[in-house]
From Swiss-Prot:
Name this protein carries in UniProt: Protein BEX6
Biased composition (Basic and acidic residues): 13-38, 63-75
Natural source organism: Mus musculus
Recorded coiled-coil stretches: none
Residue numbers spanned by region Disordered: 1-39, 61-83
InterPro entries in alphabetical order: BEX, TF_A-like/BEX
Gene that this polypeptide is encoded by: Bex6
Note: The human orthologous protein seems not to exist.
Keyword field contains Mitochondrion: no
GO cellular component: cytoplasm
PTM entry text: Ubiquitinated. Degraded by the proteasome.
Tree of life domain: Eukaryota
Main location: cytoplasm
């Protein structure tokens, strides 16, 4: 088996050097050799999996930012965030208030109670 492997490697190097084609027999052997090298003994094919690496710098448009100049705006952003939270809470409470509020006196005065 080792002599076949050496022969295939030699044929491939000769093919690359000359720019010509190696023998068809060596091409078939190289294909078989590649299959053997990529398979585990159990018969499972070994494949390289490309994993995505998280890049946490993508949201930063410029890494050379003067961080001291953003301190004035920090208070404004915090204020905007609290305002947004307050508005969303008001929207949520608007729909739940009718369930929690007691009936008004005018409801009794109108005679709507059977």
């Amino acid at each position: 088996m080792m002599s076949k492997v050496k022969q295939v490697i030699q044929d491939l190097t000769v093919e690359k050097d000359k720019g010509g084609e190696a023998s068809r027999h060596s091409e078939e052997e190289s294909h078989l050799l590649e299959e053997v090298e990529t398979k585990n003994p159990g018969g499972y094919v070994k494949r390289k999996v490309r994993r995505l690496v998280c890049n946490f710098r993508w949201p930063t448009p410029n890494r050379h930012v003067d961080h001291s100049e953003g301190r004035e705006d920090a208070g404004r952003f915090v204020g905007q965030e609290t305002e947004a939270k307050r508005k969303s809470q008001e929207q949520w409470m608007r729909f739940s208030k009718w369930f929690l509020t007691p009936e008004s006196d005018s409801h009794y005065n109108l005679g709507l109670i059977p």
